[in-house]
């Protein structure tokens, strides 16, 4: 249990910050100790427990934030200039265009844009993109970590290898295994498309390789060598489940290297959701574990945009997930397995990698912690056992896989962590990306909804829309453009530079209270190639 001073000083500091910025303070005991009134917009993945939570406060909406500042006794201005805003927004952006052959792009994917905007320090989100070299297709994914970034980092490095191996034919697996045994160079199976900030752990590479090799050896033994078509859905499910199993096993076995031993335990005790797309020609598979989302942007005949959801959130808002959990455990746990819209009253996503506190037996948890390094044994969170923990596992990493056959009207796919979906409706996301890609945004009338707008306000909105053209041209990345809207949109749906500047100026200790990490990948499809596939079949 943290010492009283450890609980006291964070509380005092955040109360002081709330007075400086005019915001409500939601303290460790969940008492509102500062004005103005506070209504949470969204909740974090973990509900605090006195055993390991010293301070907790959910995010507020921007409206509550600005209202609080409006009446602050000493208002403080901290505006970033447009170049400074752009520097922050573009720091993590990455774009990839599929290369052409003989002046033609024969892939159903034109390319993709990705970007990240941190709220946590360090950011807990991760992203990955790679082209499969020994099989057809491209893999793209976003990973949302919680209780730290260790698990999301490991999954972002490893999952695509497990998927690629699961898709390989028997003869290719044999060729790779023979190359390892004879010390020859291995066939490359993935070509990564990475931002310079997207790193791989060199220290853990050998450990990860050995676990992956054990997996493909088992696949070789299971396969008789007969040429059979590989089921992509089954391959995705097997890859997700096997990686999660390896994460758990590595933590149980440990490692002689003290650094690696602590690393595998950090990975296992933290958690991550994953939303991965595999695109092969017109075949699009989305494998989702958790509450990140995949959204398809469809352009209708009249030029309007519609959003098609290709994933389901695995949380309390999904009645099928709640029912699944209740059916997997005894009836006397029906009221405790999902409590306050959380798994065992603690965890928001009902599916995730890692999070062994919701998977291992109590005896196994105690045994691993007691034999682990001091950092783990001294950590109050790892020693805390969830309440009503009777029949584990309560959590799974098994993905829900959705299949969609691409059509010419399917223009793009948005993969994003929940930091985006908490701030924007799916239809707005698709419309903004669609208008950005087609340059049609300026033709849309201004929508004011039920707001009463004066002539002066309307003039301001028209001025903003004119200025919006320049922001589109300065954004060379669709994901960056979407983040700009997610963080800077006002109540009329236009980017407000003052608001955007304020949100990006928040200090680290306040940023997480108003938004989450945001990670986005926008995949643009090649309508001509997709249409050619369709014509060939007809």
Curated annotation (Swiss-Prot):
Keywords: Acetylation, Calcium, Hydrolase, Magnesium, Metal-binding, Mitochondrion, Protein phosphatase, Transit peptide. Binds 2 Mn(2+) ions per subunit. Binds 2 Mg(2+) ions per subunit. Mn(2+) can substitute Mg2(+) for catalytic activity. Residues 109-525 form the PPM-type phosphatase domain. Its EC number is 3.1.3.43. Magnesium-dependent and calcium-stimulated. PDP1 activity strongly depends on its Ca(2+)-dependent binding to the lipoyl domain of E2 subunit of component of the pyruvate dehydrogenase complex. Mn(2+) 2 binds at residues 144, 418, 516. The modification N6-acetyllysine is found at residue 202. One of its GO terms (molecular function) is calcium ion binding. Residues 1-71 form a transit peptide. GO terms for biological process: dephosphorylation; signal transduction. It is found in: Mitochondrion. The keyword Nucleotidyltransferase does not apply. InterPro entries: PP2C, PP2C_BS, PPM-type-like_dom_sf, PPM-type_phosphatase-like_dom. SMART domains: PP2Cc. Its cofactor is Mn(2+); Mg(2+). Gene3D superfamilies: PPM-type phosphatase domain. It catalyses: O-phospho-L-seryl-[pyruvate dehydrogenase E1 alpha subunit] + H2O = L-seryl-[pyruvate dehydrogenase E1 alpha subunit] + phosphate. Its main location: mitochondrion. Heterodimer of a catalytic (PDP1) and a regulatory (PDPR) subunit. Mitochondrial enzyme that catalyzes the dephosphorylation and concomitant reactivation of the alpha subunit of the E1 component of the pyruvate dehydrogenase complex (PDC), thereby stimulating the conversion of pyruvate into acetyl-CoA. Belongs to the PP2C family. This is [Pyruvate dehydrogenase [acetyl-transferring]]-phosphatase 1, mitochondrial. It comes from Bos taurus.
